[in-house]
């Protein structure tokens, strides 16, 4: 079974798959009479032919080492995941190789940080590490089949 070392999440390392949703070192501007920092346009919602919707997903925790054998993608829209509580989580993503997932990568997402996956990016299921977690999810709803799931030879992610 293939073993994959979990990587720290950085904007540069994650860029081929999407965006890191975290405050910038400095805000783009101050709003609300100078009481609120606005970190503007951290990601774009892709919604080819549909509407952007907001949902809450509740996911059970996983333990490391974590075995992954299922990937999915959403060809018509991006999908953003923002944890609503504290705790690190694992984001599993893979490049597309001729319509199939390539070698997966695992990123350790720190507590309070989210990610936005571009349309068509292969990814694993939600994997909070410490405890069950709720995630605010922004994605697309509309016509067309916007979910493709595939099984892959199992890979194990660990630190």
Regions found by a protein language model. Give the residues of each.
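Non-catalytic, conserved peripheral segments adjacent to functional cores
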Residues: 1-106, 130, 138-139, 143-150, ...
């Amino acid at each position: 079974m293939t073993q994959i070392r979990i990587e720290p999440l950085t904007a540069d390392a994650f860029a081929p798959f999407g965006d890191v949703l975290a405050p910038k070192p400095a805000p783009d501007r101050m709003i609300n009479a100078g009481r609120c920092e606005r970190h503007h346009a951290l990601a774009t919602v892709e919604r080819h032919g549909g509407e952007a919707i907001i949902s809450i997903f509740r996911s059970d925790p996983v333990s490391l080492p974590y075995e992954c054998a299922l990937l999915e993608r959403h060809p018509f829209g991006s999908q953003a995941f923002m944890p609503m509580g504290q705790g690190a989580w694992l984001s599993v993503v893979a490049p597309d190789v001729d319509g199939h997932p390539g070698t997966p990568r695992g990123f350790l997402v720190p507590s309070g940080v989210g990610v936005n996956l571009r349309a068509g990016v292969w990814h694993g299921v939600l994997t909070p590490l410490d405890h069950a977690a709720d995630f605010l999810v922004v994605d697309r709803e509309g016509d067309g089949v916007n979910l493709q799931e595939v099984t892959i030879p199992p890979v194990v992610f660990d630190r």
